[in-house]
């Protein structure tokens, strides 16, 4: 569905009611809608200069990026319970999606937006600075080269899963959790087990997000880091990317 003529708290509420009638009240309770509205207006205003979205997605920012992210954050927050004292990273964040929406919670973690390229994220950095938004950090680094030791990491539309696990393996402390945003359940189980094993992770749980069926199939996995990656991992971005493009990995959109 195309975006409303004007983004406002009311127009966002109306779309939330339409898309998530049973969960709308709880979603609104969790989030700072004023901050969501400000960020949504920023995404629209800076879309062309920042190259944030494709031509089609530029007409559906609210559904395909804002509401999708909000709903993921809502479901993850319900499972986690409290973000107090937690640092959460968003790998390959682009303009800050979905990571910024964790900062839009009323009770939020410290959020670290991570991307190796400044083209999109630098605009968000300026937006955060001009609005004096706290507890939001920026890291312009390659994920596989970083050792941030975060409690949680999420990713959306990043390098195809399960190779994304390898790429983020050094971002997360042992005992921490990686939550990739995924599409269909068409992942090679043996390949998944192999990558999780050498990256030091274990599958804890998986949740289908049936309320997002208007966008297609969506699900999330909760992957706990139980050990350091095996020697030689993670590999360079070039090697991970090359193998992931061989047709073995799956991202959230497929």
UniProtKB/Swiss-Prot annotation:
One Gene Ontology term, aspect cellular component: cytosol
Similarity field: Belongs to the methyltransferase superfamily. RNA methyltransferase RsmG family.
Domain of life: Bacteria
PANTHER family for the chain: S-ADENOSYL-L-METHIONINE-DEPENDENT METHYLTRANSFERASES SUPERFAMILY PROTEIN (PTHR31760:SF0)
Location in the cell: Cytoplasm
EC number: 2.1.1.-
Protein name, as recorded: Ribosomal RNA small subunit methyltransferase G
Keywords: Cytoplasm, Methyltransferase, rRNA processing, S-adenosyl-L-methionine, Transferase
MF terms in GO: rRNA (guanine-N7-)-methyltransferase activity
Residues given in the record as S-adenosyl-L-methionine binding sites: 92, 156
Job of this protein: Specifically methylates the N7 position of a guanine in 16S rRNA.
Gene name, Swiss-Prot/TrEMBL: rsmG
